[in-house]
Amino acid sequence: MSEAARPEKTKTERRLEKSVELNASPEQIWSALTDPKQLVQWFPLVARVTPGLGGKFFLSWGPDYEGEGEIISWEPGKRFGWKEPLGTIEFIIEARGGKTILRLVQSAFLSGEDWENEWFESTSYGWGFMLLSLHWMLERHPGADRQIRWPRQKTSLSREEAYARVFSAGAIFEIDARSLAAGTTYSLRTTTGESWSGTVEFAKPLRGICLSIRQLNDALLWFTIEGTPGKIDAQIWLSAWGVEESRLDAIHDKLAIRLRETLA
């Protein structure tokens, strides 16, 4: 059968929903979602917004990680959403008992390809970190500028092998990071000479781990393993507010070297 005659695979809707309770007003959250100056303090590296229904919403983490969508929901203080190639993303804002509930709803129409399944799982996992970053920006670092350091390394290793190498004792940490449990406190040393303590914000086997770091003014450090077999991408996101750039640069350079050596 020729490619032209091949029947198109049936696509089905996959939907993910997440919510977070925030000590912020609906107006503050609306600004965090729609003001480019606010967006870059918790979400992308670059943001551009053309306000209003039918406007454009552009997000970028660099040339390989960027996109633009059409705004499909624009109700100030209540609802904001945009359309992407695979589906839609909407945020619903609801004031409740002096706090605000922010609900994320993302739907995508997928045909079941391996890369689509991986994209959906990575997206669901990634939103956990992004919503945590929003919480950190609004409640712990209001008005502060975020600094991002983002070493990453591609590898042909399997996900299981990459995860085992990155999180085993002697790679990035001096302990086996696979033993860290979400919601617990930790105190450890890295193989780059840093002494860190804080809370394990979340952890997921074969995906990664997120730590808060007291020694970096309550920064967030997120390790994530993404990609399909043979095309694994190991990434370290360091989000810090109010920390000297030179200090973050030094940490980035050391982590990048260790990540490269670990996955070689």
Which residues are covered by each model-predicted region?
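A generic structural signal for alpha-helix starts
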Residues: A24-E27, K37, S122-Y125, F129, ...
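Short, conserved charged micro-motifs
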Residues: E27-S31, R159-A164, E244-D249
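Surface-exposed beta-loop interaction hotspot
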Residues: F109-A164
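Glycine-centered tight beta-turn/hairpin loop motif at sheet-sheet or coil-to-beta transitions
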Residues: E13, G62-D64, L86-T88, T191-S195, ...
